[in-house]
Design a protein with these regions (language model features):
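N-terminal Rossmann NAD(P)H-binding glycine-rich loop of SDR-like oxidoreductase domains
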Residues: 15-35
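NAD(P)H-binding glycine-rich loop region in Rossmannoid oxidoreductase-like domains
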Residues: 47-53, 57-102, 106, 110
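A conserved pocket-lining segment of Rossmann-fold NAD(P)-dependent short-chain dehydrogenase/reductase
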Residues: 92, 143-146, 194-214, 218
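Short alpha-helix in the Rossmann-fold core of NAD(P)-dependent oxidoreductases
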Residues: 97-104, 108, 120, 151-155, ...
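Conserved Rossmann-fold NAD(P)-dependent oxidoreductase catalytic core, especially the SDR/UDP-sugar
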Residues: 105-150
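Catalytic helix-loop patch of NAD(P)-dependent Rossmann-fold dehydrogenases
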Residues: 133-180, 201-204
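Substrate-positioning beta->alpha
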Residues: 153-157, 185-190, 205-227, 234-238
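Mid/C-terminal beta-alpha module of Rossmann-like enzyme folds, strongest
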Residues: 225-286, 302, 321-325, 332-345, ...
């Protein structure tokens, strides 16, 4: 499908952003403001976006479950970037479906209603999560079955809905990052810190499997490139760091950066995974998808993003770790970061938002 001709922008762009007070959305918001783009953010709590407002962003209060609020925020914009999501597979299945699937449907409906020409949505490499190594996989490689885990399946459905919506009037692009890490992470990183303090971040086996990582500012830059690229509509792109690391290498560097105990070897995958499958659904048990993400090798081919988005990751893991350490220090250290850790969304809150929106 061809893109609307005005979807390729040379100057400042008017962008509406969901998830701007979160980890990934926050990085995208800062990048857009650094560039001088005109930014409107849709947030549930205006006070959480005060720093963005101070930098010139327009703050609109509304829920992802309210397509009318999204449409109001989107009027006059060129691009909508959908970065709201749930990073943890431990959220309830209902919360995952409401936020990831229904939220994406609402964003797309609102964007079309508001007359936008382009949407860029953040998907995940987990849409192909399975009990297989995914080494040198590109966007053409797919699973013969649904991915493993409620979150992965919800992400997969949301991505399919988004890409099937793309047409000559509303161009939709999906970005698939790997393990997203870096400054601003108040969801996954606090959990890793607690785990490290309990004896080290656990691996399954010796951690010699490859791990596909994506520094958060690299992801933000890829999103901006996708919003401007003429060949992006209706396409999906893997985005990752410029280095290929084994899990143990990445966790060693992360632990050292945060002055935490190093990662620890755990039971072999051949034992841990079947046990997790049997125990799935029991409170507190390690989820099968959590083991897959840490034990199976992942290395995604990013040549399509290089060729079609003119985007190439340049921030090294070492540089990203330095920025992560600076952010933690500016927060006041690990204890201050842990105090700000974000809880998982609960069903009751989402139901209230849906009811208020008439969903």
């Amino acid at each position: 499908l061809s893109a609307p001709t005005s979807a390729c922008y040379d100057g400042a762009v008017k962008v509406v952003l969901t998830g701007a007070t979160g980890f990934i959305g926050g990085a995208i918001a800062r990048r857009l403001l650094d560039r001088g783009d005109e930014l409107t953010v849709l947030v549930r709590d205006a006070s959480a976006a005060s720093a963005l407002a101070a930098r010139g962003a327009t703050v609109t209060v509304g829920s992802l479950l309210d397509p009318n609020a999204i449409a109001r925020a989107s009027r006059g914009a060129d691009v909508l970037v959908h970065a709201a999501g749930i990073p943890s597979p431990r959220a309830s299945a209902r919360a995952l479906r409401w936020t990831l699937v229904a939220g994406t449907e609402n964003v797309l409906s609102a964007a079309r209603h508001a007359g936008l020409e382009r949407v860029v949505t953040i998907s995940s490499a987990d849409v192909t999560l399975a009990n297989v190594d995914r080494v040198h996989w590109d966007e053409k490689r797919d699973l013969a079955q649904l991915p493993i885990g409620e979150r992965a399946r919800a992400l997969r459905l949301a991505e399919e809905i988004a890409l099937s919506t793309s047409d000559a009037e509303l161009a939709v692009t999906a970005i698939r990052p790997g393990w997203v890490w870096g400054p601003g992470d108040l969801s996954t990183l606090p959990e890793l810190v607690r785990e490290a303090r309990s004896g080290g971040i656990r691996m399954f086996g010796d951690g010699r499997n490859l791990v596909a990582t994506t520094y958060v500012e690299t992801l933000a830059d890829a999103v901006i490139a996708a919003a401007r690229a003429p060949g992006a509509p209706g396409q999906v792109y893997y985005v990752g760091d410029p280095e290929f690391l084994e899990l143990r290498e990445f966790l060693q560097v992360l632990s050292r950066t945060l002055t935490l105990p190093g990662p620890r070897s755990g039971p072999p995958f051949a034992l841990a995974y079947p046990l997790a499958v049997v125990r799935a659904g029991r409170g507190g048990a390690t989820l099968p998808e959590e083991i897959l993400r840490r034990a199976r090798s992942t290395l995604f081919d990013v040549q399509k993003a290089i060729a079609e988005l003119d985007f190439r990751a340049t921030i090294t893991v070492d540089e990203g770790m330095k920025r992560l350490a600076t952010w933690v220090s500016e927060l006041g250290g690990l204890e201050a970061m842990l105090a700000q850790a974000r809880p998982l969304p609960d069903d009751a809150t989402l139901e209230r938002e849906a009811s208020a929106a008439g969903a």
